[in-house]
A protein has these predicted regions:
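Aromatic-rich carbohydrate-recognition surfaces in CAZymes
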Residues: 256-396, 433
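An acidic intrinsically disordered interaction segment
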Residues: 218-239, 295-304, 392-409
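Eukaryote-specific, cytoplasm-facing alpha-helical/coiled-coil scaffolding segments in long proteins
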Residues: 293, 362-373, 411-416, 460-467
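Terminal accessory carbohydrate-recognition/targeting modules of carbohydrate-active enzymes
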Residues: 2-22, 28-235, 243-247, 251-257, ...
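Acidic/His metal-coordination segments adjacent to aromatic residues that form catalytic metal sites
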Residues: 240-249, 305-330, 408-428
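C-terminal/domain-terminus segments
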Residues: 226-230, 235, 355-365, 454-463
């Protein structure tokens, strides 16, 4: 599934029944034993055959595109990375058949560093496949190539032929372990860099793809869902593929990454069906990406996207960050006022007092500063102070100009994330009429419960005391 609505869609289905440059690669690659992977399923959607796989350090989404413009794409939640092959236009439509489902593998690059990926076999009824472009990088660049046909020069990768194989591989631009995709022809032949069909008009390939980005830690189904969750296998599988201890993803293949609004809405909708560990993973991901002002990050840029973004724009906000640290976008304002209601619902309605206190005391490691951490309670309190500060002008002077506007210089700032979404307006109704009142009410509830007392000075408590 390819849109950011995937997780919210899964929430509805679950709750309905619940009652709510690599110079070369080493030849040796380790294929996981024949035991079934922890998660493996397929979804055919329109012209796309999608095969999802997760097993230990491997998480990958293989997409085979049918039609006159075939392509192969593998997306990895690790680093929101991916590899893709786009082929020249065909005279007629051609269809892929996945003849062997993806198997997880761990391999080594030429410097002995691990890459995590998959191997699968497929056939396609086409007389010839000529590779138009290979893109190996962060998925944002794969999306760019898909939509506008351009990528940065820094990530261009040459094609290499070796017998019956076509190989594309490279290190990341900072020299870290990178990406690879290899096509071995199993039926037909290679000719001048193109794959020519056999006498029966079919092409057969073995595909290997891998990424060197740091693996994420998947949440098992037992850690993710409780007994109230619907017995909907498709929804469970999709949710599991998108759920990790480090964060929840918005959707695959295009959005295997964090979005603040998507995370908070999904956690709240799914809360009746989620295990505490899953709720805490979602809220924790938001806290880990909060800025010093208490604002919630809308989106993150990862791995090679972050590296190239910094090379182009520099660390305008902080030049002490690592070159490959995530870049965080704080342009949206609606998610700032979603955190308090979601956190209050969990801490006051679903978790026991002991669970709530334990969660708030847990250290949350910063997503951008390796080794930096603060208690979850301190981070949540920071957001509540931001909410109250932003709401104070309207409390003191109840007129239109005291409402909370979208940020200066922007045409977007909430879920209607398009330049015409607010009709060129500055004051979003949902933010001011629904989200801010909900955030203030949640602040008052949390303050009254005393859960945040260890994380507030007397002055800060006084700041928040008039919230509700």
């Amino acid at each position: 599934m390819s849109t950011r609505t995937t997780r919210t869609y899964m929430a509805g289905r679950l709750l309905l029944v619940a009652g709510l440059g690599l110079a070369s690669l080493t030849a040796c690659a380790h294929i996981s034993p024949s035991a079934a992977p922890e998660l493996a399923y397929q979804v055919t959607e329109g012209q796309n055959i999608n095969a999802f796989l997760r097993d230990g350090p491997v998480a990958a989404h293989l997409l085979l595109r049918n039609g006159q413009s075939p392509r192969i794409l593998v997306a990895f939640p690790a680093g929101n990375s991916g590899v893709g092959l786009w082929f020249d236009q065909l005279a007629g439509s051609a269809n892929w058949t996945l003849t062997q489902t993806p198997q997880p593998l761990t391999m080594r690059d030429s410097r002995g560093r691990p890459l995590y990926g998959l191997r699968a076999t497929a056939t396609i009824g086409a007389p010839r496949l000529a590779i138009r472009k290979a893109v190996l990088s962060n998925v944002r660049f794969l999306r760019d190539y898909e939509s506008v046909g351009r990528i940065p020069d820094e990530i261009l990768v040459p094609k290499r032929s070796d017998g019956g194989r076509l190989i594309f591989s490279r290190d990341r631009t900072d020299g870290a372990p990178g990406y690879m995709i290899e096509v071995r022809v199993t039926h037909g032949r290679l000719e001048d860099g193109s794959i020519i069909a056999g006498a029966d008009g079919n092409i057969g390939i073995e595909l290997t793809a891998a990424s060197g980005e740091t693996p994420l830690t998947g949440l098992s189904e037992g850690e993710l869902l409780n007994e109230r969750a619907a017995p909907d296998a498709a929804a469970r599988h999709a949710l599991a593929f998108l759920s990790y201890r480090e964060k929840f993803m918005a959707g695959s293949w295009r959005f295997n990454t964090y979005f603040g609004r998507d995370t908070l809405m999904s956690v709240r909708l799914l809360m009746p069906a989620l295990q505490p560990a899953a709720v805490e993973a979602g809220i924790g991901a938001v806290l880990a990406r909060m800025n010093e002002a208490g604002e919630v990050a809308h989106e993150e840029g990862l791995s090679e996207f972050a590296i190239l973004d910094r090379r182009k724009n520099g660390n305008a906000a902080d030049d002490t960050l690592a070159a490959d640290a995530p870049t965080l976008d704080f342009g949206m304002i609606d998610d700032d006022y979603m955190l308090a209601p979601v956190a209050a619902a969990y801490l006051l309605e679903y978790a026991s007092t002991e669970q709530a206190r334990a969660f708030l005391a847990q250290p949350v490691v910063s997503a951008t500063r390796a080794g930096d951490h603060e208690p979850a309670g301190a981070l949540l309190a920071r957001n509540l102070r931001h909410v109250v500060m932003q709401a104070r002008p309207f409390a003191e002077r109840q007129n239109a100009l005291s409402l909370i506007p979208i940020k200066a210089g922007r045409l977007t700032g909430q879920w209607r994330d398009s330049e015409e979404g607010l009709g060129r307006g500055r004051y979003a109704y949902d933010v001011n009429a629904a989200l801010v009142p909900a955030a203030l009410e949640a602040t008052g509830r949390l303050l009254h419960a005393g859960l945040l007392d260890p994380y507030l000075s007397p002055a800060e408590r006084g700041e928040l005391s008039g919230a509700a």
